[in-house]
Each structure stands twice: as structure tokens, then as C-alpha cells.
Amino acid sequence: MSNLPESKGPEYLYTNTDLKLVFTDNCHIMPKLTKLLYDSGVRRRVGISVTHPGRGIGWHADQDPERMDEMVIRGIIGLDVRVEEGEQCYLGLGTPNNGLKFHIRDNKSSFFYSRVPHHVVNELKYPRYCIILDHSLPKKTVRNK
């Protein structure tokens, strides 16, 4: 996946009026993945996330717009995550002093409420590629376990 195009400037948007969706260049480059995600019900937002070696995203809580009766649930699915002995690549949820680690691996998925504080760590030798997707769910259907 190292030959995936990374943003080098403005991204073009394509409107599909039949589906009532807006697509980007990546949807034309990866039509099978686009169809799979669309057929799976992904409608809010989806993208491919690349985190380079030794990089990450510090602790934060996303303020995605959501209606009063909904929650945005974010998913992360490992596409190309080459973990070697002693390396770490994970999504941390909670707080810096009291958090949970969800290891990011090939074909493994994790879902969480995007307003919960979280961070991402990539201590690998290689970039890690993931699908990031958002689902909008009615609050009345979401249980806190």
C-alpha cells in the first residue's frame, strides 16, 4: 500500500446525485473498496489514514457535528500495519492517566465514540494504513458497556 497517493494539494470532489453522496479521487482509484463500504452502510465519512513511523496524534476529543438524538461512532480498521517485535501501534481511549489501549493490526477493527478523549501512537518502522469511518447512530440504540 506504500504506493497509495497521498495529498499533494487540493482534492477534487465528485457529486453522485443518484446516491446523494460526494466522492473524492480515492473513490475512483479504489472502486472495489468504495463499493464495499457503501454496500456496508457507510454514508457519513470514510477515508484512509496514514500515520508515518514515530508519529501519532496527541490526546484530543473530536467535536464532530451531531444532532441531539445521534452519536458519531468512529471506526478504525487496519489495512497495512507491519508490527515487529517490541513495536507499538495503538489507539488509546480515556485519559493520559487512565486509558485503554486498542492495538491497531491488519484486519482488526475498533469502534468508539469520537467525543471520548483519545490518541494514536505509531512506533513502527513503517507507515500504518487504516480505514477511518464514521457512523451516525441514534442515541437510543447505543448501549454503554
Give the residues covered by each predicted segment.
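Non-heme Fe(II)/2-oxoglutarate
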Residues: 1-40
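Ligand-binding loop in jelly-roll beta-barrel domains
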Residues: 116-130
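Intrinsic disorder/low-complexity detector
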Residues: 5, 18-20, 27-28, 62-66, ...
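Short peripheral tails and domain-boundary helices/loops at the edges of structured domains
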Residues: 129-145
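Short catalytic/ligand-binding loop motif for oxyanion handling, primarily in non-cytosolic enzymes
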Residues: 57, 119-121, 139-142
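Catalytic core of non-heme Fe(II) oxygenases with the double-stranded beta-helix
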Residues: 30-111, 128-130
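Structured loops at beta-to-helix junctions and adjacent beta-edge loops in soluble globular domains
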Residues: 1, 16, 49-51, 78-80, ...
